């Protein structure tokens, strides 16, 4: 097992296959356990950045669809629905450990634009008292 005792910042990336059951519905037990582990890392003094995708799949399930849509407008609608659902659950679960979450939306255009990229870096740096949650 690797020794992470000297590591200051830990980035944890999860996607739909980790967050959801095969039905597309959230695996609440798994999400809760993941947040418990991240909160413990945060409590031990680590900076934790949680990068999560899966909004589209979660949104499709919440909208009653049996699969992710193919058309862009439906994809966008499902992502919007799913993002609200994910952030609601993350906020609720992290609150159990007295941690505040912040959302930073990461897209290719944000990373490729110098000013936007600096804004993201500043936000993540400033939120040293929170556990930032990012979506790719």
Question: Would you name each region that the model predicts?
Answer:
Residues 1, 86-95, 119-126:
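Short, charged beta->alpha transition segments
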Residues 1-49:
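N-terminal glycine-/serine-/threonine-rich phosphate-binding loop
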Residues 11-13, 47-59, 101-103:
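Short beta-strand segments at enzyme active-site cores
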Residues 18-20, 55-59, 111-112:
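Short, active-site-adjacent cap segments at secondary-structure transitions
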Residues 48, 91-104, 129:
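Short, flexible active-site-proximal loops enriched in glycine and acidic residues
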Residues 61-83:
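A charged helix-plus-loop insertion that forms the helical arch/lid used to bind
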Residues 74-78, 106-115:
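Flexible, glycine/proline-enriched loop segments at strand-loop-helix junctions
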Residues 127-136:
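Conserved small/polar residues in nucleotide/adenosyl-binding loops
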């Amino acid at each position: 097992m690797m020794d992470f005792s000297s590591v200051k910042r830990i980035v944890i990336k999860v996607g739909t296959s980790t967050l959801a059951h095969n039905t597309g519905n959230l695996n609440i037990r798994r999400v809760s356990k993941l947040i418990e582990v991240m909160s413990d890392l945060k409590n031990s003094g680590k900076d934790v950045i949680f990068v999560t995708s899966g909004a589209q799949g979660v949104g499709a399930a919440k909208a009653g669809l049996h699969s992710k849509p193919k058309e862009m407008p439906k994809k966008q609608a499902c992502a919007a629905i799913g993002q609200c659902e994910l952030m609601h659950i993350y906020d609720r679960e992290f609150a159990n450990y007295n941690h505040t979450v912040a959302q930073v939306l990461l897209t290719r255009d944000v990373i490729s634009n110098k000013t936007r990229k600096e804004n993201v870096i500043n936000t993540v740096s400033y939120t040293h008292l929170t556990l930032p949650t990012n979506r790719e």
